[in-house]
């Protein structure tokens, strides 16, 4: 929360520090204040998709360039090439993932959506789309804090949101994401890796499949408190909360926070 107010005060200080302007030059348009933008990748994938490991590597390379905390990837296992968990098999398919797969009319995998702009894109288009998304401006900021209690596997999530402009209507989405999941993955030539390590896997939508409707105001930051119990089998030291604010124009800001800081 303190960081959000620092950003606001910085903008005010800039305005107060301006020199007086001659009347002939008073109507020069000044760019609106903006906040550092992060980018969300919704990576649609599946354990039976032989080309998906290559797509995962492509995302890793992009994150190496931009930073994993700025280019935030979420692997959504969904569709006919995704597999569900059974008593004897670790599957990563989820109902919420299938909901998104159907809603966005994903034709096949691997495909990815970037900040919910441009539709579902093939791997070859990803670098250009990432570059385009980072060049967009935003006036929305999000800070995320997590407090985990081991005894009951409960996490207290504090989400602080702010905007530098007029009121903005949208939805706050909270996702549970997990790293380091050992589960089978199919490769080209039907090669099966039974101990493939899957990262940033979507496990659950914490506050509903489409999030919670909010209105952000420049007058004050908005604080959202959420209590969530981790599902059975989730490793808290490998888990993240991903939070993003979006509306009909796309994702305006995204951030992530580890449930247990190490």
Where are these regions (language model features)?
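Bacterial Sec-dependent N-terminal signal peptides
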Residues: 3, 11-40, 44, 50
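Membrane engagement elements in two modes
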Residues: 33-39, 54, 61, 91-94, ...
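Alpha-helix termination/capping residues and helix-transition junctions
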Residues: 12, 65-68, 106
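Loop/turn elements at helix/coil->beta-strand transitions in domains of secreted/extracellular proteins
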Residues: 38-39, 68-72, 108-109
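Typically the conserved alpha-helix immediately C-terminal to a functionally engaged Cys/Sec
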Residues: 51-67
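Short, conserved sequence motifs used for protein processing/export or organelle targeting and
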Residues: 75-262
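The canonical Cys-X-X-Cys-His
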Residues: 44-55, 73
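Conserved active-site beta-strand-loop modules that form the wall/rim of enzyme catalytic pockets
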Residues: 9-10, 172
């Amino acid at each position: 929360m303190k960081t959000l107010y620092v950003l606001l005060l910085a903008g005010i200080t800039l305005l107060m520090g301006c020199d007086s302007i001659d009347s002939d030059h008073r109507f020069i348009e000044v760019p609106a204040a903006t906040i550092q933008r992060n980018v969300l990748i919704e990576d649609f994938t599946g354990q039976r998709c032989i080309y998906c490991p290559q797509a995962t590597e492509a995302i890793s390379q992009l994150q190496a360039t931009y930073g994993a905390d700025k280019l935030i990837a979420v692997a959504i296992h969904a569709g006919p090439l995704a597999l569900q968990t059974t008593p004897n098999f670790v599957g990563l398919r989820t109902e919420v993932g299938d909901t998104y797969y159907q809603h966005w009319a994903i034709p096949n995998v691997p495909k990815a959506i970037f900040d919910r702009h441009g539709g579902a894109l093939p791997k070859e288009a990803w670098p250009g789309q990432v570059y385009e998304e980072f060049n967009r401006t935003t006036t929305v900021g999000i800070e995320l804090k997590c407090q985990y209690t081991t005894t009951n596997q409960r996490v207290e999530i504090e989400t602080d949101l702010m905007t530098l402009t007029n009121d903005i209507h949208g939805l706050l989405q909270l996702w549970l994401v997990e790293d380091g999941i050992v589960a089978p993955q199919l490769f080209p030539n039907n090669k099966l890796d039974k101990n493939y390590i899957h990262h940033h896997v979507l496990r659950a939508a914490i506050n509903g499949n489409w999030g919670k409707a909010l209105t952000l105001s420049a007058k004050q930051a908005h604080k959202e408190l959420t209590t969530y119990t981790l599902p059975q089998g989730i490793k808290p030291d490998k888990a993240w909360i991903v939070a993003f604010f979006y509306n009909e124009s796309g994702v305006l800001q995204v951030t992530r926070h580890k449930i247990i800081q190490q």
